[in-house]
Swiss-Prot record:
<feature type="binding site">
    <location>
        <position position="214"/>
    </location>
    <ligand>
        <name>[4Fe-4S] cluster</name>
    </ligand>
</feature>
<dbReference type="GO" id="GO:0051539">
    <property type="term" value="F:4 iron, 4 sulfur cluster binding"/>
</dbReference>
<dbReference type="GO" id="GO:0005524">
    <property type="term" value="F:ATP binding"/>
</dbReference>
<dbReference type="GO" id="GO:0034227">
    <property type="term" value="P:tRNA thio-modification"/>
</dbReference>
<keyword id="KW-0004">4Fe-4S</keyword>
<dbReference type="InterPro" id="IPR012089">
    <property type="entry name" value="tRNA_Cyd_32_2_STrfase"/>
</dbReference>
<comment type="function">
    <text>Catalyzes the ATP-dependent 2-thiolation of cytidine in position 32 of tRNA, to form 2-thiocytidine (s(2)C32). The sulfur atoms are provided by the cysteine/cysteine desulfurase (IscS) system.</text>
</comment>
<dbReference type="InterPro" id="IPR011063">
    <property type="entry name" value="TilS/TtcA_N"/>
</dbReference>
<feature type="binding site">
    <location>
        <position position="123"/>
    </location>
    <ligand>
        <name>[4Fe-4S] cluster</name>
    </ligand>
</feature>
<keyword id="KW-0820">tRNA-binding</keyword>
<keyword id="KW-0460">Magnesium</keyword>
<keyword id="KW-0411">Iron-sulfur</keyword>
<protein>
    <recommendedName>
        <fullName>tRNA-cytidine(32) 2-sulfurtransferase</fullName>
        <ecNumber>2.8.1.-</ecNumber>
    </recommendedName>
</protein>
<keyword id="KW-0819">tRNA processing</keyword>
<keyword id="KW-0479">Metal-binding</keyword>
<comment type="subunit">
    <text>Homodimer.</text>
</comment>
<dbReference type="InterPro" id="IPR035107">
    <property type="entry name" value="tRNA_thiolation_TtcA_Ctu1"/>
</dbReference>
Length: 310
């Protein structure tokens, strides 16, 4: 019996190490691709107590130990005084890690409850208040970058939300300047899959704090988009990866935004632009390869992307 437990423990540790390596590699690649972290940076890691931010802090600590540059981390949590919030959990966890941290106490819960009618979602106002407090805290701490735990699925969901409900082809940038113009915000998990983060978080045993202590309901539109993408991921292996790659291979001349591309000046002397267009025939859609080491099944040609049935 003891041998079976030991063997199972070894197998679990192997799987954990393998998953950590993949998340670490994806995070490191995103940091490099977007120059998220530079020598001498002081990174304020926003820690909500959820799986994403716990994983982000864990991986950044790991990368910090072997990075060719020097940077420091300070974890920050905003205690918004929501009923039932376990205020002791994060300080105890962060103390055990030996990482620098700051708990900011601001009763935004009462403000939101006072301003938002009962039954209405509080997320929008809560988010604005939280953002302002975190910007202020970053300045107080002398942070050069603010790290958020959004992952690849969040980025894709935002793209489809904006297309379906906002009429914009706009996602969630891996790196940006904050809306007050004073901070650089980074998303180190931009290349990481949510399902990997969920699995990794479960294996790591983080002291997860529920995100719905305020009683607010999740955004229904985002939930619908998430369900749609999860369904595609199950039915059409590789589609999610291909869509994310598409966000990195934008061809403005083959879209319709005349602010991004000068269509008006095109004439027959302009030459072929970005490969041109076959014009009168339907373009053959290439079957993209699935770049996922966990997918061992053969790709079924019958699952080839049909752009008329999405």
């Amino acid at each position: 019996m003891t041998e079976q437990i030991q063997e199972r423990t070894k197998a679990q540790q192997y799987n954990f190490n393998k998953l950590q390596k993949r998340i670490r590699r994806n995070t490191g690649q995103a940091i490099a691709d977007f120059n998220m972290i530079e020598d001498g940076d002081r990174i304020m890691v926003c820690l909500s107590g959820g799986k994403d931010s716990f994983t982000m802090l864990d991986i950044l600590i790991s990368l910090q130990k072997s990075a060719p540059i020097s940077f420091s981390l300070v974890a920050v949590n905003l205690d918004q005084k929501q009923p039932g919030f376990p205020a002791h959990v994060l300080p105890e966890y962060l103390e055990s890690l030996g990482v620098e941290y700051k708990i900011v106490e601001e009763d935004t819960y009462s403000i939101v409850q006072d301003k938002i009618p009962e039954g209405k979602t509080t997320c929008s106002l809560c988010s604005r208040l939280r953002r302002g407090i975190l910007y202020r805290t970053a300045k107080e701490l002398g942070a050069t970058k603010i790290a958020l735990g959004h992952h690849r699925d969040d980025i894709l969901e935002t793209l489809f939300l904006n297309m379906f409900y906002g009429g914009k082809m706009k996602g969630m940038p891996p790196k940006l300047v904050s809306d007050n113009g004073e901070h650089v915000v980074i998303r180190p998990l931009a290349y990481c899959r949510e399902k990997d983060i969920i699995k990794y978080s479960d294996m790591a045993g983080y002291p997860i704090i529920p995100c719905n202590l305020c009683g607010s309901q999740p955004n229904l539109q985002r939930q619908n988009i998430k369900q749609m993408l999860n369904d595609w991921d199950k039915r059409f292996p590789g589609r999610i990866e291909t869509m994310f790659r598409a966000m990195q291979n934008v061809v403005p001349s083959h879209l319709a935004d005349f602010e991004l591309f000068d269509f008006k000046s095109i004439n027959k002397d302009s030459g072929v632009i970005n490969g041109g267009d076959i014009g009168f025939d339907k373009e053959e859609m290439p079957v993209a390869t699935v770049e996922d080491e966990d997918m061992v099944q053969e790709f079924d040609p019958s699952l080839k992307l049909d752009v008329t049935n999405i």
